[in-house]
């Protein structure tokens, strides 16, 4: 293993942490409708639980309404029930074979709770990134111990790892700020 391998590996892992954080943020409901909100809803499809996207077409009807069109008419009631029981605070309404899912307006108190959740998720993502930094630095120290690189190379590489860490932590902070702004906009 070389210094380049360590740096490349840690950067890829940090980028994956950022992607996972973005996915977590997408699940947090804001006042606006987006189809990603229903991504983790599971529907009972002939005895097995499948994601809603595998049994229905999700569309945005308008800024505050998601349209869910099940591919099979007999699935309408099951899809509606799954959305209702997903504990998202949503109340779907069926019109024929189209399920409309209106986004209720968030109360001020709920907005504040959601910003706390966003900050907490952000901290978790930052901790994950810092743990990756620690692992990379340990790998570099092992290379020095095994006499594969010099201490100067290790110092330069750990500085580079720190720069990567700072860059990714700043990206998490930016994502947290934009999500908070999105939540607090009425």
Curated annotation (Swiss-Prot):
Subcellular location, record wording: Cytoplasm
Protein name, UniProt field: Ribosome-recycling factor
Top-rank taxon: Bacteria
Classification via CDD domains: RRF
Function: Responsible for the release of ribosomes from messenger RNA at the termination of protein biosynthesis. May increase the efficiency of translation by recycling ribosomes from one round of translation to another.
Family statement drawn from the similarity comment of this UniProt entry: Belongs to the RRF family.
Matches recorded under InterPro entries: Ribosome_recyc_fac, Ribosome_recyc_fac_dom, RRF_sf
Keywords attached to this entry: Cytoplasm, Protein biosynthesis
SUPFAM superfamilies in the cross-refs: Ribosome recycling factor, RRF
GO-annotated cellular components: cytosol
Biological processes per GO annotation: cytoplasmic translational termination
Native organism taxonomy: Bacteria, Pseudomonadati, Pseudomonadota, Betaproteobacteria, Burkholderiales
Principal place of residence: cytoplasm
One GO MF term: ribosomal large subunit binding
HAMAP family reported for this sequence: RRF (MF_00040)
């Amino acid at each position: 293993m070389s210094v380049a391998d360590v740096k490349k590996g840690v950067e890829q892992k940090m980028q994956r942490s950022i992607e996972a954080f973005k996915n977590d943020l997408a699940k947090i409901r804001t006042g606006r409708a987006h189809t990603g909100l229903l991504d983790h809803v599971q529907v009972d499809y002939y005895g097995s639980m499948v994601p809603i996207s595998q049994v229905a077409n999700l569309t945005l009807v308008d800024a505050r309404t998601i349209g869910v069109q099940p591919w099979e008419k007999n699935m309408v009631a099951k899809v509606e029930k799954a959305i209702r029981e997903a504990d998202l605070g949503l109340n779907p309404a069926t019109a024929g074979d189209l399920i409309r899912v209106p986004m209720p307006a968030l109360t001020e108190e709920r907005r504040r709770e959601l910003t706390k959740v966003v900050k907490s998720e952000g901290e978790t993502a930052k901790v994950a990134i810092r743990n990756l930094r620690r692992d990379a630095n340990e790998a570099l120290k092992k290379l020095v111990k095994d006499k594969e690189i010099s201490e100067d190379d290790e110092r330069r590489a750990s500085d580079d790892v720190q720069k990567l860490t700072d860059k990714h932590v700043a990206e998490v902070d930016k994502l947290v700020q934009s999500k908070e702004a999105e939540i607090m906009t009425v």
